[in-house]
Curated annotation (Swiss-Prot):
It catalyses: a quinone + NADH + 5 H(+)(in) = a quinol + NAD(+) + 4 H(+)(out). It is an enzyme of class 7 (translocase). The keyword NAD applies. Its EC number is 7.1.1.-. It is a peripheral membrane protein. It comes from Cupriavidus taiwanensis (strain DSM 17343 / BCRC 17206 / CCUG 44338 / CIP 107171 / LMG 19424 / R1). This is NADH-quinone oxidoreductase subunit C. One of its GO terms (cellular component) is plasma membrane. It is found in: Cell inner membrane. Belongs to the complex I 30 kDa subunit family. Keywords: Cell inner membrane, Cell membrane, Membrane, NAD, Quinone, Translocase, Transport, Ubiquinone.
Length: 199
């Protein structure tokens, strides 16, 4: 039995109906679970002797608005975790979709894998995914006064405000964005004997 088949069978046996979907692509398995089962599944993935995913390597947020060809009709926001079992030499991708697109909430995995701390803060900062139960869920990379979540696909490229140093006030201030849309039409300059041809 192939390694992925063994892992797939172990996941189905340990998790049962909690498995919403198991996708195999490019030699890796992705386990998709409901938001309500997310925390319980994580606990089982870590503690079940047949699985033993001791390490969470990464977690990131994903915005599925306008996904692929635009035909996505599922929930908009997901948290995707990369897990590693040192015991069994397995890798697994765990994905859970937040049920509310306007206020995405998922349970925090900090009591299962404490390495998720800053990853969840980053997903909150960039995507606005709230991780319920996180002890210090605040912005980690953007400024504290930042408006919005910059990795959301509907966030404007130019942003809402810009910061600059004001020499009169001797401090950094916020002001509305002053970037104006530009028309990027190339300007053609002809040279008289370009390429040896008279123009």
């Amino acid at each position: 039995m192939a390694k992925l088949d063994t892992l797939k069978a172990a996941l189905e046996k340990a998790l049962g109906k909690r498995v919403q979907n198991l996708v195999e692509a490019t030699g890796e398995l992705t386990l998709i679970v409901k938001a309500d089962d997310y925390l319980d599944v994580a606990q089982i993935l870590r503690d079940d002797p047949s699985l033993r995913f001791e390490q969470l390597i990464d977690l990131c947020g994903v915005d599925y608005l306008e996904y692929a060809d635009g035909a996505w009709d599922g929930p908009r926001f997901a948290a995707v975790s990369q897990l590693l079992s040192v015991t069994h030499n397995w890798r697994l991708r765990l994905r859970a979709f937040a049920s509310d697109d306007d206020f995405p909430v998922l349970p925090s995995l900090i009591n299962v894998w404490n390495s998720v701390n800053w990853f969840e803060r980053e997903a909150f900062d960039f995507y606005g995914i709230v991780f319920d139960g996180h002890p210090d869920l605040r912005r980690i990379l953007t400024d504290y006064g930042f408006v919005g979540h910059p990795f959301r696909k509907d966030f404007p490229v130019s942003g809402f405000v810009e910061m600059r140093y004001d020499p009169d006030q001797k401090r950094v201030i916020y002001q509305p964005v002053t970037i104006e849309p530009r028309e990027l039409t190339p300007r053609v300059i002809r040279e008289d004997k370009y390429g040896g041809v008279e123009h």
